[in-house]
Amino acid sequence: MTNMVRWLFSTNHKDIGTLYFIFGAIAGVMGTCFSVLIRMELARPGDQILGGNHQLYNVLITAHAFLMIFFMVMPAMIGGFGNWFVPILIGAPDMAFPRLNNISFWLLPPSLLLLLSSALVEVGSGTGWTVYPPLSGITSHSGGAVDLAIFSLHLSGISSILGSINFITTIFNMRGPGMTMHRLPLFVWSVLVTAFLLLLSLPVLAGAITMLLTDRNFNTTFFDPAGGGDPILYQHLFWFFGHPEVYILILPGFGIISHIVSTFSRKPVFGYLGMVYAMISIGVLGFLVWAHHMFTVGLDVDTRAYFTAATMIIAVPTGIKIFSWIATMWGGSIQYKTPMLFAVGFIFLFTIGGLTGIVLANSGLDIALHDTYYVVAHFHYVLSMGAVFALFAGFYYWVGKIFGRTYPETLGQIHFWITFFGVNLTFFPMHFLGLSGMPRRIPDYPDAYAGWNALSSFGSYISVVGIRRFFVVVAITSSSGKNQKCAESPWAVEQNPTTLEWLVQSPPAFHTFGELPAVKETKS
């Protein structure tokens, strides 16, 4: 009973962070299964495993996106690493609102349940993650499936809003003595910026999907031209949330990568203030570029010119971050342990994804590339190899602190190389498919596209083998087997620890600090 009470009613940031990790892992496995089903269907031309059920294909696409974004990356990055390490890094005893933290987590399992049940109602929700009307309207999806998906998004959104309020309050009000804003570790800064993005963008999504809900069930016509509405309004509202959302997914990853690159290069981060202002700039600019997802809907030419220019400007702070990471490594005494491998992989692959993003920012080019596999390749390079690589990097970096045991280094490196090879083989050929005009969200294709699709599907099978390696590592590390106890500071940063998590025991005590740590100075 006491164990159940500990986990159900927990107000401890580390316990809640662990729950987020477990939840993210479960959702991630499900999302990966869906992606493999998608790649099996696309492995060769003609109807394959889905037997011609094209609605089911779109349900898989939709569920894959929702699972990976709202139930894997966000819970693991912000809920998992954020909850676990933000209080420790700022020298706080816990989060500002511990019980709010608990409900933030426990809103997610019901939300996941609603999403999964939507697949079992009538023909499921085959709208794509954007849920565009009129396809998501009552005439095209007549059952309750889309309504269930909308409620799922509502719950997940409330969870994220409450969590972000908690993080903002914690970071502003609960820093330890001497921990000024300009001494905050970069991961804490990244979570702070992310929390503001969530707080400002999610209410807009909530408004859009609530309007869609009333369109479907109460005969309003917000998005129905027959009653004076406009489906393009939905797209504006959705993408005003949707674009900040992609930065929400990647910003905490930026913070994690900064810590890792600094630790394994044995140097402080190059240009700390520049890194902070770059993240803030990315956050602000992220709200000013949403219509680059809509270049093909008939926007005015000067509107498209503005959104093209604004989108390209985001590349500037992003470039500052990438060059600062490279400058941190420059002249450093680099150790290629597993976290550093994932961090270097992140920098390389995220840069490729960023370059294809610059290509897509051109409204003229995007007319040709919109809704082709070029776009799929672009955002999977920044998510599947950006956000997910950052998650893996953070896991290997902090797993000793979380479990109190060291991970098997060789298995970790094997995991990296299999995954690196697999994801590249999956997504690089998609650039060629997109340039040849293969459209997204379509389960069949002409024979001309067969070669690259077969290669892509093969790559996804390799990625699954890599993920299986990862769970082997988790199992070995979490069990009290041969692997030895983890030191307070496994990466030997005792000489000059720059962050507080390496000064507490591994794993940290239930109440991390006996007395609040005072930060005297930061050595440069």
From Swiss-Prot:
Coiled-coil spans in chain: none
Note describing how the cofactor binds: Binds 2 heme A groups non-covalently per subunit.
GO molecular function terms noted in the UniProt entry: cytochrome-c oxidase activity; heme binding; metal ion binding
Keyword Cell inner membrane tagged: no
Entry cofactors: heme; Cu cation
Crosslinked residue numbers (1'-histidyl-3'-tyrosine (His-Tyr)): H243-Y247
Binding locations of Mg(2+): H370, D371
PROSITE patterns (alphabetical): COX1 (PS50855), COX1_CUB (PS00077)
Binding site for Ca(2+): E41, G46, P443
Gene Ontology biological process: electron transport coupled proton transport; oxidative phosphorylation
The keyword Calcium belongs to this UniProt entry's keyword annotation: yes
Residues the record lists as binding Cu cation: H243, H292, H293
Ranges annotated as spanning the membrane: 18-38, 66-86, 103-123, 148-168, 186-206, 237-257, 269-289, 312-332, 340-360, 379-399, 414-434, 447-467
Protein family per UniProt: Belongs to the heme-copper respiratory oxidase family.
Function: Component of the cytochrome c oxidase, the last enzyme in the mitochondrial electron transport chain which drives oxidative phosphorylation. The respiratory chain contains 3 multisubunit complexes succinate dehydrogenase (complex II, CII), ubiquinol-cytochrome c oxidoreductase (cytochrome b-c1 complex, complex III, CIII) and cytochrome c oxidase (complex IV, CIV), that cooperate to transfer electrons derived from NADH and succinate to molecular oxygen, creating an electrochemical gradient over the inner membrane that drives transmembrane transport and the ATP synthase.
Subunit structure: Component of the cytochrome c oxidase (complex IV, CIV), a multisubunit enzyme composed of a catalytic core of 3 subunits and several supernumerary subunits. The complex exists as a monomer or a dimer and forms supercomplexes (SCs) in the inner mitochondrial membrane with ubiquinol-cytochrome c oxidoreductase (cytochrome b-c1 complex, complex III, CIII).
Name of this chain's protein: Cytochrome c oxidase subunit 1
The encoding gene: COX1
